[in-house]
Amino acid sequence: MLENKILLLGLGFLGEEICNEALKRNYDVVKTRLHKSDGIIQLDINNHSKVKNLIESQKPEIVINCISRNDIDNLEKNPKLATDVNVTGPKIIAEACEKIGSKLIHISTDSVFDGKNGMYSEDKKPNPINIYARSKLDGENEIKKMCKNYVIVRTNFFGINKFGKYLLNDILTKLKNNEKIQGFKDVIFTPLSTKNLSQQIMDVSFSDYRGILNLSANKPISKLEFCNILANKLNFKNFNIIEESIDNFNFIAKRPKNTSLDNSLSKSIVKHKSVDFEEWLNFSTMEIIQHFNLENNQK
């Protein structure tokens, strides 16, 4: 096993930010992605022998697994897709990590809870209500069985990214085009920015902590509040945010309402404090304006 070497599985939205944070700290990072890309190892999580061989040949001190299927409605119709990537994949990774003594950091989700109560601590019993969430919980359980040295990170996140299909991008695109935005007043979460989350993931990677860990914001926020705070902070004058209840929508997969997490335990483990959404906006406004070409909106 090679000290200070990280194998990062899944260089996507969160993975890229983790990579940046690891490089800032002078770690050696080996990266994988599903599709071919220069300087990045092409890896399909369903190619089990290649996954095992990669981990065993690289001998990293830390393996960070960001690979996941989270297209919730599609997975509800195609549960095998969820099982292959979110259950069997983590099992194979955990087996290989255990064999060579690598520490596994696995990115899970706040959606393992049914959303009836909120502010869930690590010891609360999960109760997934859709195929995606069930597969993520099953993946957690496979890791627990296969591997001793692991951290399962339950979280939710947002950020500025080039992939264009995530919460912040979706809201800002609609605000810019003056499109209607459905703001759910009863969908509540505790998201971290990808940058803040990556800092905390790196903190815990080289800590002595083992087990499940919530990495989340301090205060819950509804999707409606999230939208309104963003629109007001960026000086949108004529935005069309409609207050809605998720009860009025018939998604293919059920959605939990309040998946907010209690991050009390993490405060004694990570060095970087959790930054709530509104505080994050205070020092990220200019980056958002430039990334989304909102300069005219500021006049």
PLM-predicted stretches and their roles:
Residues L34-H48:
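Rossmann-fold cofactor-recognition segment
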Residues N141-F189, K195-N196, M202-D203:
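NAD(P)-dependent short-chain dehydrogenase/reductase
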Residues I45-V85:
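NAD(P)H-binding glycine-rich loop region in Rossmannoid oxidoreductase-like domains
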Residues G183-I188, L213-I221, I269:
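Glycine-rich Rossmann NAD(P)(H)-binding loop
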Residues D84, T88-I92, V112-V153, G159, ...:
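Catalytic helix-loop patch of NAD(P)-dependent Rossmann-fold dehydrogenases
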Residues D276-K299:
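Amphipathic terminal alpha-helices
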Residues K77-I105:
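NAD(P)-cofactor binding segment of oxidoreductase domains
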Residues Q200, S207-I252, K257, F292-N297:
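Mid/C-terminal beta-alpha module of Rossmann-like enzyme folds, strongest
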